[in-house]
């Protein structure tokens, strides 16, 4: 949102990242001037990215070739892009063995220029994946060094997400990507960060429900005592996962904890 972007810009954050070009263009129209990475660049949105100086993630040769073609058509040169490497997530990204071909393709054109190279950690928030995380970091470091050696300008590197920032300080390189941590969510211990937002609602109705009766879908909320149940007008459509039900989470009502009942 604009409010989050404005706060980050005021604190001189180097880069913002959004999912699609439309989000980036809306921030530009609202006055955000910070550099913006587009993490899911649509093939139909290249013109928008050029016009609003929105820098796309590039994860495949097909996307790279289409972007270069669009840039040449618009007369765009040296447009910054962000190269994604697949070091183990196996969703999007160039494989490390693609690096020689990628470098060759980048060097025989002038439309785009690599501004950063990055990857995504699979399990940085879990001790059980530490060996794999270290393998990812080593793979990334080797491939990114190969890319950097081919170009005279500095190419930024980033692989750490919120948990990675906390647990792998030696892998912070030149940038990090703070996501959940921006909102005070600590995916590792839930102890280091403080929540920065509060979701407030109102109570629509209160009813007394007898012991052994149930509340909610599939009769999941079985009552082991006579209970007073409050209904509130928010749920999974507002981002509350159904798995938070049956006492897993709670609301604060007049300063007292009221656990969720049902799912």
Language-model segments: which ranges?
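Active-site anion/phosphate-binding pocket segments in diverse small-molecule metabolic enzymes
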Residues: 5-6, 10, 20-25, 41-44, ...
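Active-site-proximal beta-alpha core segment in soluble small-molecule metabolic enzymes
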Residues: 1-158
């Amino acid at each position: 949102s604009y409010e989050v972007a404005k706060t980050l810009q005021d604190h001189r954050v180097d880069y913002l990242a959004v999912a699609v070009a439309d989000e980036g263009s809306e921030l530009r129209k609202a006055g955000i001037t910070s550099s913006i990475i587009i993490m899911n660049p649509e093939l139909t949105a290249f013109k928008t990215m050029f016009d609003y100086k929105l820098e796309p993630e590039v994860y495949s040769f097909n996307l790279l070739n289409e972007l270069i073609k669009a840039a040449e058509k618009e007369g765009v040169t040296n447009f910054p892009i962000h190269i994604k490497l697949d070091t183990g997530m196996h969703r999007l990204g160039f494989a490390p063995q693609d690096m020689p071909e990628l470098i060759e393709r980048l060097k025989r054109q002038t439309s785009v220029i690599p501004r950063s190279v990055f990857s995504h950690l699979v399990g940085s928030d879990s001790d059980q994946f530490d060996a794999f995380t270290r393998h990812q970091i080593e793979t990334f470091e080797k491939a990114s060094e190969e890319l950097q050696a081919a170009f005279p300008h500095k190419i930024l590197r980033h692989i750490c997400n919120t948990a990675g920032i906390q647990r792998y300080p030696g892998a912070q390189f030149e940038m990090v990507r703070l996501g959940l941590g921006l909102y005070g969510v600590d995916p590792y211990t839930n102890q280091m960060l403080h929540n920065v937002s509060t979701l407030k609602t109102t109570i629509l109705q209160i009813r007394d429900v007898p012991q052994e009766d149930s509340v909610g879908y599939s009769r999941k909320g079985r009552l082991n005592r006579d209970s007073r149940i409050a209904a509130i007008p928010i749920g999974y459509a507002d981002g509350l996962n159904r798995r938070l039900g049956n006492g897993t989470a709670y609301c604060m009502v007049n300063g007292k904890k009221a656990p969720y009942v049902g799912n």
